[in-house]
Design a protein with these regions (language model features):
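Positively charged n-region of N-terminal signal peptides that target proteins for export
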Residues: 1-5
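Bacterial N-terminal signal peptides
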Residues: 6-15
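Sec/Tat signal peptide C-region and signal peptidase I cleavage site
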Residues: 16-20
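Short, flexible, glycine/charge-rich loop motifs used to bind or transfer phosphoryl groups or to couple energy/partner
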Residues: 21-22, 87
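Short, solvent-exposed loop/hinge segments that bridge or flank secondary-structure elements
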Residues: 22-75, 126-136
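Beta-sheet ligand-binding and adhesion/scaffold domains
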Residues: 30-44, 87-139
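Predominantly extracellular/secreted and cell-surface proteins with exposed
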Residues: 57-103
Length: 139
């Protein structure tokens, strides 16, 4: 292999990690989406209802406001007409989002700089919730 080919190969492998690191978009601002949820038991503050005999399907409009971001770490609020949760989160190097609030956890994916999918799970002796919401950043 020629000296030039070695230099090009080295340059490509040196730049790739830096490019991957800078791929994290600016998430600050307001995001909105409609959940697709399934709930057993009384649910949680957002999906509250009288317990049914079996699982029930539910959809809720959510707003997420991200007010702090430092690289891969961010925090803010996740709200609906029924509740408000403070959230903290981190983005993995592969673009996965790991988020927690006071009663459950969320795993998500950055789909585009202005779109993400967040899937929330809660399990307790009284209630279970599984919910996915595609969030779109508002202008």
């Amino acid at each position: 292999m020629s000296k030039f080919a070695w230099i090009v190969t080295f340059a490509v492998f040196s730049v790739t990690p830096a490019a991957a690191e800078s791929a994290i978009p600016n998430l600050l601002g307001t995001w909105k989406g409609e959940s697709e949820s399934i709930v057993m038991g009384p649910g949680n503050a957002h999906h509250s209802a009288a317990p049914a005999a079996g699982p029930r399907l539910n959809s809720i409009t959510f707003t997420m406001t991200i007010d702090k971001q430092d690289g891969r770490r961010f925090s803010g609020a996740f709200t609906s007409a029924r509740g408000n949760d403070t959230i903290i989160a981190v983005i993995s190097r592969n673009g996965s989002i790991y988020m927690v609030d006071d009663d459950g956890c969320t795993i998500g994916t950055i789909l585009a700089p202005n779109r993400m999918e967040l899937c929330y799970m809660r399990q307790s002796p009284e209630a279970r919730v599984a919910s996915c919401t595609e969030m779109t950043k508002q202008p």
